[in-house]
From Swiss-Prot:
The gene is coaD. It comes from Staphylococcus haemolyticus (strain JCSC1435). This is Phosphopantetheine adenylyltransferase. Substrate binds at residues 11, 43, 75, 89. NCBIfam families: coaD_prev_kdtB, cyt_tran_rel. Its cofactor is Mg(2+).
Length: 161
């Protein structure tokens, strides 16, 4: 039987416990889970792609079926390249759905063989976003409930002044 492969795309700038929640829950449902770090042209990154990948790899090293990649192109092309049939998208709130629906519709039009599945973030992480974590970190507040220790350390270094 063919291995089931899924992709979780995102900018992960930086990875948060909300992301990790979706990754851990997805890892148990697929033979291979591929984290794809994409450049978001609408956002200026705090961490470069290599830094983000290193932070993710450290944060998910306990998951043996998870691989971290970066890709500069269309997500559906990446799915084709690795043979993934499924894209996993995390939703924090209903407000995320409209944007995600547009992405899903475009991806489906570009490649009808790839399905998108939505997973609700666990309630205790539903308010966390990378942007909010970075904003709080800039003010030297405690972010240990929102990100793994390696990410907390990296953010403190970025915002040290």
């Amino acid at each position: 039987m063919a291995k089931t492969k899924a992709v979780i795309p995102g900018s992960f700038d930086p990875i948060t416990y909300g992301h990790i929640d979706i990754i851990e829950r997805s890892a148990g449902r697929f033979d291979e889970l591929h984290i794809c770090v994409l450049k978001n042209s609408n956002k200026t990154g705090t961490f470069n792609i290599d830094e983000r990948m290193a932070l993710i790899e450290e944060s998910v090293k306990h998951l043996s079926n998870v691989e971290v990649h970066n890709y500069n192109g269309l997500l559906v092309d990446f799915c084709d390249k690795i043979g993934a049939q499924t894209i996993i998208r995390g939703l924090r709130a209903v407000s995320d759905f409209e944007y995600e629906l547009r992405l899903t519709s475009m991806n489906k039009k570009l490649n009808s063989n790839v399905e998108t599945m939505y997973m609700m973030t666990s309630t205790n992480y539903s308010f966390i976003s990378s942007s909010v974590v970075k904003e709080v970190a800039q003010y030297k507040a405690d972010i240990s409930d929102f990100v793994p220790p390696n990410v907390e350390k990296a953010l403190k270094e970025k915002f040290k002044k």
